[in-house]
Amino acid sequence: MPFTRFDRYVDRHARSFTERLQALCRMPSVAARGTGMRAVAESVEQMMQRVGMGTRSFRVGNGYPIIYGECGSGSRSFVLYGHYDVQPVGHLTEWSVGPFAASIIDGKLYARGAANSKGDLVARMAAVEAYQKTFGRLPVSLRFFVDGEAGLGSPSLYRFAAENPELLAAQGCIWDEGYKDTKERPVISLGFKGIQFLELRAHGARTDLHSKWGAIVPNPAWRLVQALATITSPKGVITIDGFSSCIAPISAEDTEALKAIELDEAGLKREFRIGSWVRSLKGPALVKEHIFGPTCTICGIQTGHTEAGVKTVLPSTAMARLDFRLVPDLTPGLVLELLRAHLDVRGFKDIEINELGSAPLAKSSGGSSVARAVISAATEIYGGPPLVYPMDPSSGPVGAFCGALALPTPVASFGISYAGSNPHGPDENIRVDDFLESIKFIGRVIHKLGEHKSRTSGITKVSGIREGRLTNSRG
């Protein structure tokens, strides 16, 4: 394949491409805060236009803009999903550099959103530019959808999908989640777990009280902790009534796929600075649990006085936020119903449940044209076959593209992160060399998309498509 000119173009423009990424990363776009969102959306649209895309900006209600861009031609179309919003920064004291400084230190670009996923977005646009400059016309039609609400559960995207099905009809979808593991092996995923993100609240007195009342006034903090303790066992197994019986058995195809996957257990434990895995899992059992195990994670608890100094207070409220990662046959709605019933039967009808966002599970076959193109390109650019996950342990609004309106669109996902990128955490970063290498990888993916045709129908599972929204459930 004649990619010499393409690779040289990327090398010659490496500084320019990197500066484009730095410029985008220096623009805060935390969806949960709302600051700067429209400015970043406009910048993304301008970047698309710069590489020759026709663009449109869509607004759904009061949501942040969805930026759509298209380029190329031909009867075969492929969707590329990305997002311009980023996670909240967290505690600034935990960052070594400013989260929006986009500083490059020892070959690593540090910024909130560099790994998740402004780096992927800029790399894909750079690949389109490089391909058109060196090959000319794109061999397929590419449709970019850039979301502004990924951190909020992408509520606008599901409505957009329902109202614009003609834009979503495609032979495949390329997602923006992926990384190199601790052994520098690229990870390609053919689907994603679903997610249900919930907030649980317990209520006590009208206001916070002096803690002298603690002997006779109910404490909502203890009430919430006691309710949470019924949801999992001390070993981390989800104990919600009826939960495990709703999970589908792992298919023969997925069981076979798991055999080719291994985790660098020692390297990951060093990276995370942990002594052991949950339930002392290891080997194939660890891989199986990581990819096909459901989760219930307490993401945060808030109650009472946690600031500096001493304050003897009896809290009036207590709140916990949980996310459930969902495997085949578990849906967001089902999890909400099971949890409500589980708490009610144990006397916790007073615990309020608010649904903050959700996304369905979606997974597809390795025989689709998009999967084969991505795997082939990865093998070529990285010097060996990638690790192929039948389902990524993370989640996203994949169902909007790969199951909404019965569109049988297969998905393949990859990204520019590495094991130390720490997306969602402090000092989020990518390696600049990985960013530039990814541009070359994407160029080859585009080329191969024009060559490969599906051996299978593609999509194999979409569970519980549902728009992320805020609801209230109280027994």
Could you describe each region identified by the protein language model?
Residues 85, 231-235, 340-349:
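A common structural junction motif
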Residues 187-203, 411-418:
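Flexible glycine/proline-rich, aromatic-decorated loop/lid segments
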Residues 182-183, 239-317, 325-338, 346, ...:
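An extended, acidic, His-containing surface patch that forms the Zn2+-binding/catalytic region
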Residues 2-112, 133-142, 322:
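Acidic/His- and Gly-rich active-site-bordering loop/insert found
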Residues 105-116, 384-388:
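Short pre-catalytic strand/loop immediately N-terminal to key active-site residues, enriched for Gly-Thr
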Residues 214-236:
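A short core secondary-structure module
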Residues 109, 115-191, 455:
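Acidic/histidine-rich catalytic neighborhood of metal-dependent amide-processing enzymes
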Residues 84-86, 145-154, 176-180, 204-207, ...:
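Acidic, glycine-rich active-site loops and adjacent beta-strand->loop/helix elements
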